[in-house]
Amino acid sequence: GHRIVHGGELFSKSVLIDDNVIKGIDSLSSLAPLHNPPNLQGILAMKSLLPEVAQVAVFDTAFHQTMPETAYMYAIPLKWYEKYGVRKYGFHGTSHLYVTRRAAAMLKKDIKDTNFISLHIGNGVSVTACKGGKSIDTSMGFTPLDGAIMGTRCGSIDPAVPLFMIDKEGFSSEEVNTILNKRSGVLAVTGRYTDRRDIARVASEGDKFCQLAQNMEAYKLKK
């Protein structure tokens, strides 16, 4: 099995990998340039090493393909969606799928009769509203950068902030992308930590920035 970050609108469930699936994953590389190409390399390597073994692609975005248009469309020029696929996709789908099914089983409820809010909290963080076992909205968007504050990702901010900083500091789009994905989040607030255990320990010792990071993250999750 291969965890594939982006299945776009092509894949709404896990699939057996064949040549058409490989082409489909490759066609979505522009939506996940850091993840889909390496995923493909892994698939092709296993196909070469073990050609007789069936391979399955499990897509991080698939669970969220049940979101309604009102949840996944953005109020931006329609051409951006039609030509480039710009919309909310959501991520951590495999995690949210498992959690909702497991929670229903623990509560001894039919999954169709449940309403859950599922939280995936690690270095990446996402929140998903699930109705009847299906995703109806989620915090991550076009990329995993959107939503809650994360270890190194900023989460939701005013879209004008990157444009403002490009104007002020002369950053390239690649530099801004790196800053928002790799140098932001609780790392930026604390100045040194991404591990919440370290943050909790130092916060208990009175460090105001670790305390602030905890409070900001909790506030954003509740919001």
Give, region by region, the residue ranges found by the protein language model.
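Short beta-strand-loop/turn "lid" adjacent to the catalytic site in phosphate-handling enzymes
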Residues: G1-H35, A54-V56, A62-M73
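Gly-rich Lys/Arg/Thr-decorated short loops/hinges at beta-loop-alpha junctions or inter-strand turns
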Residues: I22-S27, P77-Y84, R201-F209
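A gly/proline- and charged-residue-enriched helix-loop-helix capping module
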Residues: G24-G42, L49, K83-V86, S95-L97
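Active-site pocket-lining segments that scaffold enzyme catalytic pockets across diverse folds
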Residues: M46, F59
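Glycine-rich phosphate-binding loop of actin/hexokinase-like ATP-binding domains
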Residues: Q65-K168
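Oxyanion-binding "anion nests"
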Residues: I166-R192
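Adenine-nucleotide phosphate-binding core of ATP-dependent small-molecule kinases
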Residues: T178, G185-V189, R196-K222
